[in-house]
């Protein structure tokens, strides 16, 4: 079947909005293709971009994350949260262990981390902790390359390592895309007024630019769709490569707290043993409405936050829950 009759975008514009934030406008598309491609690209941008994140930390004198360090204003939990906000970029390597040492009164920021020549920090002024006169902090930070969001407990079980006292495994958010949304507007070509204009609004953490993020997501989509092109022709056959353990969308492994629901809605879900987004999307509207103290208003709130992530209630998941997923 020929696809020559389908319109392709003749105009692609990148409109900078701020630092690492841009709108990418493409037109024209055949009617309906704006939503078809916009939603697909958005979901890939949110879940499948490769980035870098701290995955393990060892601090001198610290046994576990609920400790405190003498002379340091923040406790260890706050320090770890601040470390997660440091944006790393590795060149020509997949992992690295970095060292941070500092003592004496003052602030400790990302630029105080000792870096080899092929590691870069995008936000060097990011605060890690504050020290008093007697304060001292020394730590090793392991940074890895990865994709999506991987909870620390899942990764710790999949990595057959001997547990070291003081080794703290972090939840890792590798995605360099902080926010993405799309809108479809009307476009016109000559006498045709029923066409689509796609506007992608993308903000990244600086590891990649918004336009590079779109290029990478498009390549991923093309690679996945190419499998279906092999079905063309009755005599042709295609043998898909054998896969190992089924992959779970990293978004589904996030706790429902990440949806930023109201306290009432979040507590109602946890009372029904719904702790992860993957648990939630498998419930139907009727099932949730039977939950004590969860009314129509809370249900609408849940549906809205799921829709913003391209998800709905009543979805079916295979191989859920994944092996090693902990329940609170």
Swiss-Prot record:
GO cellular component terms attached to this protein's record: cytoplasm; DNA-directed RNA polymerase complex
InterPro entries to which the protein is assigned, alphabetical: DNA-dir_RNA_pol_insert, DNA-dir_RNA_pol_RpoA/D/Rpb3, DNA-dir_RpoA, RBP11-like, RNAP_asu_C, RNApol_insert_sf
Enzyme class: transferase
Region (Alpha C-terminal domain (alpha-CTD)): 248-328
Origin superkingdom: Bacteria
CDD domains: RNAP_alpha_NTD
Keywords, in A-Z order: DNA-directed RNA polymerase, Nucleotidyltransferase, Transcription, Transferase
Reaction it catalyzes: RNA(n) + a ribonucleoside 5'-triphosphate = RNA(n+1) + diphosphate
Region (Alpha N-terminal domain (alpha-NTD)): 1-232
GO molecular function, one term: DNA-directed RNA polymerase activity
SUPFAM superfamilies referenced in this protein's UniProt entry, alphabetically: C-terminal domain of RNA polymerase alpha subunit (SSF47789), Insert subdomain of RNA polymerase alpha subunit (SSF56553), RBP11-like subunits of RNA polymerase (SSF55257)
One Pfam family of this chain: RNA_pol_A_bac
Biological process, per Gene Ontology: DNA-templated transcription
Free-text note regarding domains: The N-terminal domain is essential for RNAP assembly and basal transcription, whereas the C-terminal domain is involved in interaction with transcriptional regulators and with upstream promoter elements.
Function noted in UniProt: DNA-dependent RNA polymerase catalyzes the transcription of DNA into RNA using the four ribonucleoside triphosphates as substrates.
HAMAP family: RNApol_bact_RpoA (MF_00059)
Subunit structure: Homodimer. The RNAP catalytic core consists of 2 alpha, 1 beta, 1 beta' and 1 omega subunit. When a sigma factor is associated with the core the holoenzyme is formed, which can initiate transcription.
Assigned protein family: Belongs to the RNA polymerase alpha chain family.
Protein's UniProt name: DNA-directed RNA polymerase subunit alpha
Gene source species: Bordetella petrii (strain ATCC BAA-461 / DSM 12804 / CCUG 43448)
Gene name tied to this protein: rpoA
């Amino acid at each position: 079947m020929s696809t020559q009759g389908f319109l392709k975008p003749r105009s692609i514009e990148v409109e900078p909005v701020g630092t690492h934030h841009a709108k990418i406008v493409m037109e024209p598309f055949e009617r309906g293709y704006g939503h078809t491609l916009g939603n697909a690209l958005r979901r890939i941008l949110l879940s499948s971009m490769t980035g870098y994140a701290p995955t393990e930390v060892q601090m001198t004198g610290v046994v576990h994350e609920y400790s405190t360090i003498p002379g340091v204003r923040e406790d260890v939990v706050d320090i770890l949260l601040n470390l997660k906000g440091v944006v790393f970029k590795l060149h020509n390597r997949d992992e690295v262990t970095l060292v941070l040492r500092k003592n004496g009164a003052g602030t400790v920021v990302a630029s105080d981390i000792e870096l080899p020549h092929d590691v870069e920090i995008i936000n060097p002024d990011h605060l890690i902790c504050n020290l008093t006169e007697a304060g001292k902090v020394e730590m090793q930070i392991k940074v890895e390359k990865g994709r999506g969001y991987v909870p620390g407990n899942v990764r710790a079980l999949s990595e057959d390592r001997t547990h070291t006292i003081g080794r703290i495994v972090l939840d890792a958010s590798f995605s360099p895309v902080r926010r993405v949304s799309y809108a479809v507007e009307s476009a016109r070509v000559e006498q045709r007024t029923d066409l689509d204009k796609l506007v992608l609004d993308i903000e990244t953490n600086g590891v990649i630019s918004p336009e590079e993020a779109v290029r990478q997501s498009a390549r991923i989509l093309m690679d996945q769709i190419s499998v279906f092109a092999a079905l063309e022709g009755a005599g042709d056959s295609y043998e898909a490569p054998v896969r190992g353990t089924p992959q779970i969308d990293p978004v589904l492994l996030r706790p429902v707290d990440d949806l930023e629901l109201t306290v009432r809605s979040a507590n109602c879900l946890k009372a029904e043993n719904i702790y992860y987004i993957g648990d939630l999307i498998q419930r139907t509207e009727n099932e949730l409405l039977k939950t004590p103290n969860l009314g129509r208003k809370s249900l609408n709130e849940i549906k809205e936050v799921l829709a913003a992530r391209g998800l709905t209630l009543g979805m079916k998941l295979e191989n859920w829950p994944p092996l090693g997923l902990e329940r609170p």
